[in-house]
């Protein structure tokens, strides 16, 4: 049994257009959600003092993993390491653990922020005045 009798003038091209129009808002929403999640990333910037050696990334991973601190990635960058943590709440605990484990380094906590999209700025720019 065919459903052609429900939509007699619906061609495959029109069906494709409808599907694309339905998919675009879904894609936009998922992208905005992923941007929001990436704003919550916390980073630690580990830089050795002058003359000290850069710690091994695996050693840093082991020290943090022992304390149950979830790590997204450890990336070498010039003369330093960038440690991305799974949650900002773990940033302080990770910094304390690494200060005890690595006495010859400077550890700076950074909150990764991405700029707010233009369309989102425009939506939140004007506040409605009630009353």
UniProtKB/Swiss-Prot annotation:
Compartments, as annotated in UniProt: Cell inner membrane
Recorded topology in the membrane: Single-pass membrane protein
Coiled-coil stretches: none
Stretches in topological domain Periplasmic: 32-131
Bilayer-spanning residue ranges: 15-31
One Gene Ontology term of the molecular function aspect: protein kinase binding
Residue numbers on the Cytoplasmic membrane side: 1-14
InterPro entries on file: Modulator_MzrA (IPR026574), SecD-TM (IPR027398)
Gene Ontology cellular-component terms listed: plasma membrane
Keywords annotated in UniProt: Cell inner membrane, Cell membrane, Membrane, Transmembrane, Transmembrane helix
Domain of life, per lineage: Bacteria
S-S bonds: none
Entries under Pfam families matching the protein: SecD-TM1
HAMAP family reported for this sequence: Modulator_MzrA
Family stated for the protein in its record: Belongs to the MzrA family.
Function (record text): Modulates the activity of the EnvZ/OmpR two-component regulatory system, probably by directly modulating EnvZ enzymatic activity and increasing stability of phosphorylated OmpR.
Subunit structure: Interacts with EnvZ.
Full protein name: Modulator protein MzrA
Primary gene name: mzrA
């Amino acid at each position: 049994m065919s459903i052609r009798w429900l939509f007699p003038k619906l061609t495959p091209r029109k069906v494709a257009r409808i599907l694309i129009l339905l998919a675009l808002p879904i894609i936009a929403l998922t992208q905005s959600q992923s941007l929001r999640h990436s704003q919550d990333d916390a980073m630690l910037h580990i830089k050795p003092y002058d003359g000290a050696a850069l710690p091994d990334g695996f050693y840093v991973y082991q020290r943090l993993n022992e304390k149950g601190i979830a790590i997204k990635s450890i990336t070498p960058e010039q003369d330093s390491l960038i440690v991305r943590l799974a949650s900002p709440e773990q940033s302080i605990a990770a910094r304390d653990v690494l200060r005890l484990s690595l006495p010859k380094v400077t550890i700076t906590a950074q909150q990764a922020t991405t700029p707010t999209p233009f369309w989102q700025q425009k939506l939140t720019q004007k506040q409605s005045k009630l009353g």
